[in-house]
Amino acid sequence: MSRQPDERAYVIAYDVVDDRRRDMVAKTLGSYGNRVQYSVFIVICTQAALLRLRRKLIQIIAREEDSIL
């Protein structure tokens, strides 16, 4: 599959304390990209898709405890 001109590659890493939230973050990221390490994914998507992914992840995490880069 070839990339679209407006797609970019993003490296997304996370540190999530709670097992349930961690599983949800991994499942969400897995639906957008490929796992390259336990807490690191490569996502190739458009800016609009990245914003949708970001909104989904923000709804999952506890911002005081977790981080996503």
What would you call each of these model-derived segments?
Residues 1-11, 17-69:
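Basic nucleic-acid-binding interfaces
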